Design a protein with these regions (language model features):
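Transmembrane alpha-helical segments
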Residues: 70-82, 125-137, 154, 167-175, ...
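Membrane-interface micro-motifs in multi-pass membrane enzymes
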Residues: 90-134, 159, 290-324
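Aromatic-anchored segments of alpha-helical transmembrane domains
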Residues: 96-104, 152-157, 191-201, 284-295, ...
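Short hydrophobic alpha-helices at membrane interfaces in multi-pass membrane enzymes
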Residues: 135-154, 182-187
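Long, charge-rich C-terminal accessory regions
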Residues: 268-283, 289-379, 391
């Protein structure tokens, strides 16, 4: 939260704000759908609620705080829908901790407004959506299905991968639902498919792919198979990294006794969701694998870090639910309470966890490498306490002041002295003709803006 006040906009943040101003909000939505992308919710948010669209650069810090608040709300709603009151608070805190401790890219997915609102906000919304589905399945109340339908319309317009994953979840629910109770799920699935179709049918999608000179879309069987193979390898490699350091495995092992107690008195919603551990594990793994496929089919590239943030969120939720499902299955099979972990195992794990969190793997023993960790939280503290975030913030503010103070139409700016890993996503370049530089220049009412070579006097 502290670093939110050191965050600064980049690329699309300026681009959306500058493009929407001359057209107006309503006209820009139609233009964006026709010429750039069909993600109607994201288009609306990035122009309607973007502080830069109103010239309010000084309020950019609100974005990461709002997205974090949405993530907390989503986690709380999901835990409240599945657990009894005494367990909701601890479960929410645990879920958020496990997500944030290995968050793939805070810079691109949280502190960059465009990435956060297009992707992480959809993940937070998906948690609320899952909570609504759990309540609808339990109560059968029309109000819950209506609320789920309204949120479905919103989420289908955020980004295509999140939308496709949610459609997959609905299809699985539809297939598993009882024949006499299938109608509401059928309506919800049809609504999701219709909204996804509207987003995918946007002419702007083709224009965008052409503008970035994307490779030809996967159209032949061997190209599709190659994309599937690459996605499978990339997903497997990501899973290896997420599990390989042991943080998630050790944390889950410490939770097994608590899961055993929950399994003795589960809520109906949790019992219904986890009654088939093998199927739940397969679906959770399938969703993660499937999430890597679209970018390989479209542009033959892995998912960008901002999308991997959402995939990791899906993975952690699926992992915890699957772990609980297997523990509950074992408790039912043994027909007795689960034995607690031996004291020496608990103590060893509790002693190891802080060491694993603090390590930076600085094998070269360099001063610059201190605190540069794969653990997101440790890296964030490093950027904050080392002063890098403050220096980055001061340099960005000095740029804004210089641009506002000069009447010159063409301005060269000094390079940033530091690029903290937690905050820095992208910067303008030395080439003033690139679109990022042009969007930056338009925001400050300049003709051209560029970054000067290091050592150049302003």
């Amino acid at each position: 939260m502290v670093l939110a006040f050191r965050s600064h906009p980049a690329l699309d943040d300026f681009g959306f704000a500058g493009a929407a101003r001359p057209l107006g909000w309503w006209t820009f939505q139609a233009w964006e759908y026709q010429h750039w992308q069909g993600t109607y919710t994201t288009n609306a948010l990035l122009t309607g609620l973007n502080p830069l669209a109103y010239g309010a650069l000084e309020y950019y810090w609100l974005s990461p705080l709002l997205v974090l608040a949405a993530l907390v709300l989503g986690a709380w709603q999901l835990c409240a829908a599945l657990l009894n009151p005494p367990h909701r608070g601890p479960a929410t805190a645990l879920l958020l901790m496990l997500v944030l401790v290995q968050f793939p890219s805070p810079a691109e997915g949280l502190y960059w407004l465009t990435g956060a609102w297009a992707y992480l906000l959809s993940g937070a919304g998906a948690l609320c959506w899952g909570a609504l589905l759990a309540r609808a399945a339990r109560t059968r109340l029309p109000s819950h299905f209506i609320a789920a339908g309204m949120l479905t319309v919103v989420l289908m317009g955020t980004n295509y991968v999140t939308a496709a994953l949610l459609v997959g979840v609905l299809l699985m629910i539809l297939l598993r639902s009882e024949a006499g109770r299938r109608t509401p799920w059928l309506v919800l699935t049809a609504l999701a498919l219709a909204c996804l179709g509207v987003a995918l049918a946007a002419p702007g999608n083709a224009h965008r792919l052409a503008s970035v000179q994307a490779p030809q879309l996967a159209s032949s069987p061997h190209v599709v198979l190659a994309a599937v193979a690459k996605a499978g390898v990339a997903a497997s490699y990501a899973l290896l990294n997420w599990l390989g350091n042991g943080l998630l495995l050790a944390g889950t092992l410490l939770l097994v006794p608590t899961m055993g107690k929950l399994a003795a008195h589960p809520t109906p919603a949790l019992q219904r969701l986890t009654r088939s551990p093998l199927l739940l594990s397969a679906v959770a793994l399938g969703l993660v694998m499937a999430a890597f496929l679209p970018t390989y089919l479209m542009v033959q590239l892995p998912p960008p870090p901002r999308l991997r943030n959402v995939i990791y969120l899906v993975f952690v939720v699926g992992w915890l639910l699957s772990a609980y499902a297997w523990v509950a299955w074992w408790v039912r099979r043994q027909n007795r309470a689960l034995l607690p972990l031996p004291a020496y195992v608990r103590l060893a794990l509790l002693a190891w966890l802080p060491l694993a969190l603090a390590t930076d793997h600085n094998t070269h023993l360099s001063h610059a490498g201190i605190g540069q960790s794969y653990v997101t939280v440790v890296q964030a503290y490093r950027d904050w306490l080392s002063g890098d975030a403050a220096r980055y913030d001061a340099a960005q503010r000095a740029r804004y002041a210089a641009l506002r103070a000069t009447a010159a139409p063409n301005v060269g700016l000094p390079p940033l002295p530091v690029q903290p890993a937690t905050l820095f996503y992208y910067d303008i370049s030395a080439n003033s003709t690139l679109w990022g530089n042009q969007a930056y220049a338009r925001f400050f009412n300049k003709k051209a803006v560029w970054v000067q070579p290091a050592g150049t006097k302003p």
